[in-house]
Amino acid sequence: MAKKKNPQVFMDVSIDGDPAETMVFELFPEVAPKTSENFRALCTGEKGIGPRSGKPLHYKGSFFHRIMKGSSAQAGDFVNRNGTAGESIYAGKFPDESPKLRHEETGLLSMSIADRDKFGSHFHITFRPNQQLDRNNVVFGKLIQGKEILKKIERVGDEEGKPTVSVKIIRCGEYSGDKKKSDGKKNGKHKKSLRVRRKKRRRHSSSESESSSDSETDSSESDSESDSDLSSPSFLSSSSHERQKKRKRSSKKDKHRRSKQRDKRHEKKRSMRDKRPKRKSRRSPDSLEDSNSGSEASLSDVNVEIGAKKRKHRVSRRTGNSAPAVEKEAESLHQGKRKGPDLLENRGLRSNGISDAASEQISDRQPDIVDDHPSKSRSRSLSPKRTVSKSTSVSPRRSQSKSPSSSPRWNGGRSPAKGSRQVKNLTNSRRESPGSEEKGRHVRRSPTKSVSRSPVRVKKERDISRSPSKSLSRSPLRSPKRVISRSPVRGRIARSPSRSPVRSASRGSLGRGPLRRSSRRSPSRSPVRSSRRSLSRSPIQLSRRSLSRSPTRLSRRSLSRSPIRSPRKSVSRSPVRSSRKSVSRSPVRSSRRRISRSPVRSSRKSVSRSPIRLSRRSISRSPIRLSRRSISRSPVRGRRRISRSPVPARRRSVRPRSPPPDRRRSLSRSASPNGRIRRGRGFSQRFSYARRYRTSPSPDRSPYRFSDRSDRDRFRSRRRFSPSRFRSPLRGRTPPRYRRRSRSVSPGLCYRNRRYSRSPIRSRSPPYRKRRSPSASHSLSPSRSRSRSKSYSKSPIGTGKARSVSRSPSKARSPSKSDSTSSDNSPGGKKGLVAYD
């Protein structure tokens, strides 16, 4: 029907070098015939060389140069391959076509109208409905197969449209039954070639294993054992070859005979399996670990063999051979033999970099081939899943006794299947290499820990696996604390949160990290998180800030720059911080309050955050959100900006000017605040004025810029009846009067008046000042500083009274301003202040 009529094209797309996956598009020639034909011809490459560019008019080999997460992907520059050029099949004169379809679905193909003469080969694929493209782009097709690959493409983009990895069009063309047939032919050829490849690979693997066995430290034993091992793979290869011949012959015979031969084959397999384990057990009766690893390896070898046969076709195609299984068998045996000695000799540093690299490369492609052989730490890191196992195994090897306990822990958690086995290995290794305990010191740092963390990151697959092995193995040697910090991987990864975990992990920063280093600092707060961990957390938040970076620099310190520097003190930077408590807040994350977060994010701003974070203030924590903006500002500035820090507030009480009266008044009008709360405002009267001005572009203005008179004039129509009240503060009657009134008055009119008057009052710093002295007891200054209801209103609104309160106490308190404490109301004010600055 329509779909059959419409031409279809395919694109095999590879993301970051992974195996190509196919996307099939249906074109709409009836809607946009010129554009559809252009796209189809560029997919097939049938138009030859472009007259303008001199390049083949073919999408093959070009990249997705722009990937806007949540919007669309753009590709089609086969000239420069970076989005700066393109060419259509119409030689620079692309016929105009008006848009008829809307961008209402995911996976729609469209082309820009404006740039079609210059970039006539560029096309868009939508990730979501996108109305912004409706007027500027012509829809000429849609994705009918390969939505998963489209999602993957979207994941590697960012908000700016820059792909984080390369996304390449490996092949493209017209999609039809012919393509499927050709694929089938290719597969058939592949099958035939597999046999030849297998033979060659077996030879290579046997030679490699021999050479490796020669280099073994236990020369006599290892050589003899390796020879026996090699015999089994060679025997397997020959027997498998014979089987294939038999199959050929049997194919000509009757079914009965075939079934008999099949049975014989199965029996041979069984006998071989039985023999192999015996050999292994014979080989390493000396050490428990060897025997265990041997038996496990043998089982895994059998599994590998079976799996390889079952997946013969697929494996050969992806990895190019099933021999890796045999090769791995030999390696595993060798590793099993030398595992104990290596651990003792190299202190577990030996991570077999080559194997690791190979495994990293292969991991993406053949996770199914590899079985977990805990004993072969490196070999099993192949699959991403195993990355963890790899690092785990490394960790055990690295720090046998010390790390094993923790390592098993994460191992188990990470991959239960592997877990049990690995745990065994770990325990064995523990027994086996007490000598390697030289690393005892590392134990404290417990690489394992880092491993446990890094596994989490293992998602990074490559990086992580590397990081654990590299970072961990290295780090133990280096210095419990610092080594991890170094974690090159981290450095590399530094940017991504996951990375920072890695970092942390290697550091031991994992939740446990604190154990070893946090002990001194993080204990106070959350040892597990520990300063470092907090960092790690913080880094995650600021991946960019890269705690990692800082951590890298300062093993312990770098964590949160500020926090690390002074767990408690870091706060010092900003009032909140200084309060120590504030820091604490931040520390929530970090050992102490490190503020780590806030410092990292913005020494100054963070503060505000930190206040939020203040242990006490944790309530304020919600502010954290705002923190950056209003509250955060205020706190940060708090000290330095006065904005709200009690101390600065004091100093700059003037600024808060209105707040003190406000506070007083608002207090006196407590009814109003209560009324407000009842009304669902969530703020005390204090903030009423703020609320009112909140709509104005800058809250700062009303309090500072307008005098009480101007304010009065401004709102005269509404306030006509309340001027006396405005004056009352000057007379000094205000306090009693207001108090009375607040009690008696309903939140209604008074409330409103009050609100207005309030703002004037506020702006009327003079009265405010006068009263200030009396108010001082009220902690006017703090209140004032905070009183900047404005800012408060700003952040408070979001935060709610609780927040402001919590803040003020923590802030005020931490600053140790009696007034700030005294003015619980002021908290709100304070918040306001913050917003101001």
Curated annotation (Swiss-Prot):
- Ranges where the PPIase cyclophilin-type domain occurs: 10-174
Keyword Isomerase among record annotations: yes
Biased composition regions of type Low complexity, renumbered to the chain: 229-239, 380-409, 466-478, 494-513, 536-553, 774-784, 792-827
Task: Give the main localization category.
Answer: nucleus
Tell me the function of this protein.
PPIases accelerate the folding of proteins. It catalyzes the cis-trans isomerization of proline imidic peptide bonds in oligopeptides.
Q: What is known about its subunit structure?
A: Interacts with SCL28, SCL30, SR34, RNU1 and SNRNP35.
Q: What PANTHER family does the record point to?
A: PEPTIDYL-PROLYL CIS-TRANS ISOMERASE, PEPTIDYL-PROLYL CIS-TRANS ISOMERASE D-RELATED
* Protein name as catalogued: Peptidyl-prolyl cis-trans isomerase CYP95
Q: Which organism is it from?
A: Arabidopsis thaliana (Mouse-ear cress)
Q: Which gene encodes it?
A: CYP95
